[in-house]
């Protein structure tokens, strides 16, 4: 028991998950032999140190990160929006923690309707000349995917490089023959973290929920819509599906391209950084004036960048914090920050859906909502449909 306890205790310094550590310690105390065997099987992050061992960002992009860090330190980086100046410290944190380059020459289109989003996506894919990179957590073999698949096959026949990256668990309703059909048409396909023993996974949190499409390095789509008929409101269970997706034109698309390739390299055991044409840093004309940082987090991340951004925004809010989310299950730090904000006079409002897509998670959400109501927050239920968007807003003054 003492040896096992030391092994688990040492994980506290590595994982920064004290709740999990105490759970294992109690299990080891009451059933030491069984507990130790279970810990060896499911308690360790065997994959974490191996995941995404891709090369660091190279060349011009890596230099851009370093250059921006220096200019921010010396207060030389010009923020095109006066409001953005208030987030200078957060911009710097994202640069250092996530190598998230700030770009300010982007044009962003916002889609909150699935039909409009998929129509825009297909039209942009039809204009592709060099490559199309597609990454989704969920893809269902229905009319929505078939419309996309048709365009991908046509572009592959024209000589456009097409890659499709899917998550094994999220796309479990797809069959091997569906992916083989794409391969026969000249499309590269890779599966993220294939399931073992059917659908059994020792760590279900090692999933890739990203929804990214990059076209020629010039146009990028990112957001909450997966691929399926429910996302265009054709599922009777959910009705109209409320989500948000972005179409970005401008220099920020390069960051999306890099994110896709990091995931692709891990899943396909390749190194696309060697293919220079995928990572040309275009000298963009000014498409717009929207500043963008692409921030990502996951089991491979050394820092919880997205989590820390939320925490910073909540702590610095002076007027209000508004949150829309399908799953309100915050960790202790976020929950405490929201309670403190609410009790300090900040107007905290949380909106959740009226229809669950994951019942257990839904009722867990209500448990935390109860705590927030007790702390003085206002909580709302979106009655029209399932709201899948995860979107916080805050105001300083």
Feature locations, PLM:
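Single conserved hydrophobic/aromatic residue that forms the stacking wall/gate
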Residues: 1-9, 14, 387-397
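Short, surface-exposed helix-loop/turn micro-motifs enriched in polar/charged residues
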Residues: 4, 17-19, 348
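Alpha-helical architecture
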Residues: 9, 30-33, 157, 343
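Transmembrane helix-loop junctions at the membrane interface of multipass transporters and ion channels
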Residues: 10-11, 15-19, 43
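Transmembrane alpha-helices and immediately adjacent membrane-cytoplasm interface residues
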Residues: 24-55, 59-71
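Charged, low-complexity intrinsically disordered terminal segments
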Residues: 57, 73-397
């Amino acid at each position: 028991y003492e040896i096992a306890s030391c092994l688990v205790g040492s994980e506290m310094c590595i994982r920064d998950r004290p709740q999990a550590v105490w759970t294992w310690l109690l299990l080891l105390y009451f059933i030491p032999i069984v507990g130790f065997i279970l810990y060896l099987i499911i308690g360790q992050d065997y994959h974490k140190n191996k995941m995404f061992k891709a090369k660091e960002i190279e060349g011009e992009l890596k230099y851009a990160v370093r250059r921006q860090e220096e200019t921010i330190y010396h207060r030389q980086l010009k923020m095109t929006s006066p409001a953005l100046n208030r987030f200078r410290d957060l911009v710097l944190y994202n640069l250092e923690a996530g190598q998230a380059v700030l770009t300010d020459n982007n044009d962003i289109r916002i889609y909150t309707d699935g039909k409009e989003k998929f129509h825009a996506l297909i039209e942009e894919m039809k204009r592709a000349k060099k490559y199309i990179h597609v990454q989704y957590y969920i893809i269902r073999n229905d009319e929505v995917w078939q419309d996309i698949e048709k365009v991908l096959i046509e572009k592959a026949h024209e000589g456009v490089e097409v890659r499709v990256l899917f998550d094994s668990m999220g796309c479990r309703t797809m069959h091997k023959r569906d992916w083989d059909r794409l391969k026969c048409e000249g499309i590269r396909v890779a599966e993220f973290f294939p399931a073992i023993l059917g659908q059994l996974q020792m760590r279900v949190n090692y999933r890739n929920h990203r929804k990214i499409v990059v076209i020629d390095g010039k146009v990028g789509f990112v957001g909450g819509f997966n691929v399926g008929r429910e996302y265009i409101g054709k599922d009777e269970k959910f009705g109209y599906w409320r989500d948000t997706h972005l179409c970005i034109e401008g220099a920020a698309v390069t960051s999306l391209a890099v994110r896709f390739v990091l995931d692709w390299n891990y899943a396909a055991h390749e190194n696309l950084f060697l293919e220079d044409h995928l990572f040309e840093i275009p000298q963009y004309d000014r498409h717009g004036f929207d500043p963008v940082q692409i921030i990502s987090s996951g089991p491979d991340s050394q820092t919880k960048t997205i989590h820390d951004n939320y925490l910073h925004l909540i702590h610095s809010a002076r007027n209000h914090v508004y949150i829309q989310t399908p799953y309100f299950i915050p960790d202790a730090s976020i929950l405490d920050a929201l309670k403190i904000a609410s009790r300090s006079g900040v107007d905290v409002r949380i909106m959740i859906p009226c229809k669950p897509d994951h019942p257990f998670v839904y009722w867990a959400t209500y448990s935390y909502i109860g705590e927030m109501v007790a702390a003085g927050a206002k909580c709302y239920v979106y009655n029209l449909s399932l709201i899948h968007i995860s979107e916080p807003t805050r105001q300083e003054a």
